[in-house]
């Protein structure tokens, strides 16, 4: 490890006194571009570096360009506060950030490390946040890296550009880029962060050859993307995906010409068809016009640079990063009413199935049966969840186990969170909570674990998410899932002492092993893959 410098002995007495009061004192390390100063948390025994820049601010003429290398700095750069999050609206009101404000100048990362002087070779976890590529940031409490660091892991969270700033494509942008493509700037930011990790993580005690990337929802989609991209070859040693893959119908990349047309049409609609006009706008002007358009972001792009083809095509060709994969989804990603748009009655359910699958509705009704109102609720929940995100995640799992010769571990998170500690709150769309609207339609009780609800369990952060009345059972589930994840980051295998055995999925198994994560976690044979095989054909990914 490059020298991690605790401040000079002459001032140690001062800092020791301060540490007794504040539980921290300054600590420095030298990275590629200069010296940074974070804090040493004396209570937790961790070094914390927040708001570390990993690329030039993508502002001015760097708006809508691939991230550019940092210039070196002189002196000591303070890195004790989370950097600003990417520009975004309140898309998911339940997201809670600890960062200070919003800015196009958002390319910062955060590091938690247990390293002592001359520590070397620690495994590394790089976590990408979710939020549909339109919201989120690396400072959310549920992504906090302290628990992982206390397990002997260097934990990193990364900010990346979002919405119009991160994924806008346009013919003029493609023309000016050396690689003749545009869009995907948020994914390129992530890639730049991974390259930064390769250069600098040894300064924090980490081993650049032991980097596992992870994420949930759009963060999981990002993990798929990085595995598929030729730009990330050699940068990762393992991957964890929680509910999401960049495979149709879930935020899959589109052809460059289609993305350019989408961007050009948007630019015309706001009376700024040229790149010069778009770059001349202030951050606020541009974002307000984007927000007024009611667009939910912009698509990722097969730009010939980051993405060279679709994810299924890449994996089938064996061109992906062939690394161990731990991947899964939750038992009730979204409510069944997202599909039925009405009551769980036989008449309504069958009608909706026929509308969605006019040629194959009989097969769908066998796969998602409707023998009673309760069975309809369960089937509608399964179908809604599969169409939303479970199928695409399954497809990723299936591709990697068949075309990588690497171990692939599949899970199903089934723990339903306990009641909220505050009755004035209600669960939000992105895993957190929002104020309850007394006039809102009352949703049925959840029949399984909702989208994003596993994050604080797997990261060991229940104690930081205090909206719920966590029980001993919740902490038991968290300990199990957290240890599986930590073991995987360390070794590429989730198994360890005092944990139920988790077999890797066999390449050709029709009923591959699945770890059901709940109060009593256990591995079982998959019983629902016929659903995914049907959807594979329906979406044309087979």
Residue ranges and their predicted role:
Residues 1-24:
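Bacterial Sec-dependent N-terminal signal peptides
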Residues 273-276, 288-289, 405-411, 491-501:
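Acidic/polar loop patches that form or flank catalytic/metal-binding clefts of enzymes
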Residues 285-472:
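Substrate-gating cap/lid region and adjacent catalytic-acid/histidine neighborhood
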Residues 104-108, 123, 152-153, 322-323, ...:
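Extracellular structured ligand-interaction cores
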Residues 20-184, 208, 468-481, 489-499, ...:
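Non-catalytic accessory segments of hydrolases
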Residues 189-192, 196, 222, 258-265, ...:
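Extracytoplasmic/secreted proteins, especially bacterial periplasmic and envelope-associated proteins
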Residues 91-275, 291, 305-340, 492:
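Serine-hydrolase-like catalytic core of hydrolytic proteins
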Residues 161-164, 214-218, 411-419, 500-507:
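Short, solvent-exposed turn/loop segments enriched in Gly/Ser/Thr/Pro and often Arg
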């Amino acid at each position: 490890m490059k020298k991690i410098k605790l401040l000079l002995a002459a001032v140690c007495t001062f800092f020791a006194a301060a540490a007794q009061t504040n539980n921290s004192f300054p600590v420095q390390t030298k990275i590629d571009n200069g010296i940074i100063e974070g804090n040493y948390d004396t209570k937790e025994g961790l070094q914390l570096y927040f708001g570390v820049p990993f690329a030039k601010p993508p502002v001015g003429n760097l708006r809508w360009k691939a991230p550019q290398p940092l210039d070196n700095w002189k002196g000591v750069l303070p890195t004790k506060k989370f950097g600003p999050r990417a520009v975004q609206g309140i898309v998911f009101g339940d997201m809670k950030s600890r960062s200070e404000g919003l800015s196009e100048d958002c390319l910062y990362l955060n590091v938690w490390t247990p390293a002592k002087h001359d520590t070397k070779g620690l495994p590394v976890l790089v976590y990408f946040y979710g939020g549909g590529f339109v919201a989120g940031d690396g400072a959310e409490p549920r992504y906090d890296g302290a628990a992982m660091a206390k397990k002997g892991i260097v934990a990193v969270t990364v900010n990346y550009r979002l919405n119009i700033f991160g994924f806008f494509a346009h013919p003029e942008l493609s023309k000016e880029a050396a690689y003749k493509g545009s869009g995907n700037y948020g994914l390129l930011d992530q890639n730049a962060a991974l390259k930064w990790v390769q250069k600098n993580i040894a300064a924090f005690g980490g081993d650049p050859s032991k980097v596992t990337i992870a994420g949930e929802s759009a963060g999981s989609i990002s993990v798929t993307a990085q595995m598929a991209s030729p730009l990330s070859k050699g940068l990762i040693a393992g991957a964890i995906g929680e509910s999401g893959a960049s495979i149709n119908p879930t935020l899959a990349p589109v052809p460059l010409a289609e993305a350019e047309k989408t961007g050009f049409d948007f630019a015309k609609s706001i009376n700024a068809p040229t790149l010069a006009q778009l770059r001349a706008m202030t951050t606020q002007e541009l974002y307000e016009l984007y927000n007024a358009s009611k667009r939910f972001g912009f698509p990722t792009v097969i730009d010939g640079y980051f993405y060279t083809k679709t994810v299924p095509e890449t994996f089938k060709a064996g061109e992906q990063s062939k690394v161990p994969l731990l991947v899964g989804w939750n038992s009730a990603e979204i409510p069944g009413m997202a599909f039925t748009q009405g009551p769980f009655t036989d008449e309504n359910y069958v009608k909706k199935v026929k509308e969605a699958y006019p040629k194959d509705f009989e097969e769908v009704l066998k796969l998602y049966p409707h023998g009673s109102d309760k069975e309809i609720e369960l089937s509608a929940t399964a179908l809604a969840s599969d169409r939303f995100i479970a199928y695409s995640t399954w497809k990723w799992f299936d591709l990697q186990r068949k075309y990588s010769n690497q171990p692939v571990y599949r899970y199903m998170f089934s723990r339903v969170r306990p009641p909220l500690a505050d009755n004035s709150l209600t669960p939000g769309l992105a895993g957190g909570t929002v104020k309850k609207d007394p006039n809102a339609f009352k949703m049925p009780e959840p029949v399984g674990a909702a989208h994003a609800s596993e994050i604080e369990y797997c990261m060991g952060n229940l104690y930081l998410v205090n909206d719920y009345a966590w029980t001993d059972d919740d902490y038991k589930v968290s300990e199990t899932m957290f240890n599986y994840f930590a073991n995987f980051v360390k070794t590429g295998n989730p198994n360890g002492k005092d944990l139920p055995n988790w077999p890797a999925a066999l390449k050709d198994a029709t009923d591959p092993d699945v770890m059901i994560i709940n109060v009593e976690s256990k591995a079982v044979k998959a019983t629902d893959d016929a659903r995914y095989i049907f959807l594979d054909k329906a979406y044309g990914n087979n």
